[in-house]
Amino acid sequence: MAPIVPVASVAPVHLSGPKRSSRSVYILLIPGLAWLAVFFLIPLFTLFMTSLQKESASKPGTYVFGIQLSNYANALAEYWPQFLRSFVYAGLATILALAIAYPLAYFIAFKAGSWRSLMLVLVVAPAFASFLLRTYAWKTILADDGVVTSTLNSLHLLPDGRILNTGIAVVAGLTYNFLPFMILPLFASLDRIDYRLIEAGSDLYASPAKVFWRVTWPLSMPGIVAGTLLTFIPAAGDFINAELLGSAKDRMIGNVIQTNFIEFRDYPTASALSFALMAAILILVFGYIRRSGTEDLV
């Protein structure tokens, strides 16, 4: 009978390296999560609780905690025209921004050559000026005695004889102020397209229009979706353009929220309008992303 040879015991392997590494990742997340909680989640929760408050019976003008869901119904019933106007203006500004930005982004990506860097700097340059200052500049440009209005009046293109204090001025201001947010995502998306694919379409005797709609446009869809979202979302909640470039009948929901917060101090109504606007935008955004077939963006 052969002798039994004892098998040497194998020391257990400790995977301290990967565990320690994953633990370090979670530790690094703490500052970001703390910042998100303090400056986003807690204020958001506070705003939501404020939207449910009711007016104190003993002290008119002050509000106490309560579950007052009628705040939402009353706010929407009173201010639905401003809601609708905000989405219409934001939608028009987004469409105009896309129509202006796409050819420019295409030119920078494929045709600019050595001028590419300079053109990108010029696209970003307006952002170095204050948003408020840029809007005031448009107020001067579109003034009744300005060159733009005088020229259009001489051509009989303005039925009201003016641009300032109209919805046209508000949409123009929104388009201009948020145009860089449309150009940059489009450029990034177009710049990733292999130009040989476009050349291949031409080699297969496809017309330029067919190459664009079958090749370039689908491949640039992530940039289109990102650009339209980055333009539409802030435009829908904007109040500066309507305040400076529009009239009382051109007020957007952002103006109503500002007025209720600062002037009327009707905090429940203002908070309810803010949450309703947020919910409406989220519904539109998710529907738009699903319809465009770019669910991977979320």
Feature-to-residue mapping (PLM):
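Transmembrane alpha-helices
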Residues: 31-34, 39-40, 121, 125, ...
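N-terminal signal-anchor/first transmembrane alpha helix
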Residues: 2-46, 107, 117
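Membrane-interfacial helix termini and adjacent extracytoplasmic/periplasmic loops
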Residues: 62, 135-175, 209, 245-249
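Cytoplasmic-entry segments and transmembrane alpha-helices of multi-pass inner-membrane transporters
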Residues: 25-29, 103-141, 198-199, 212-213, ...
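Glycine-rich helix-loop "coupling/hinge" segments at transmembrane-helix boundaries
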Residues: 59-62, 239-265
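Short membrane-interfacial helix/loop motifs at transmembrane-helix boundaries
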Residues: 40-79, 141, 145-146, 246-248, ...
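C-terminal transmembrane helix and the adjacent membrane-cytosol boundary/short C-terminal tail
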Residues: 2-11, 16, 27, 187-198, ...
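Transmembrane alpha-helix signature in integral membrane proteins
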Residues: 77-110
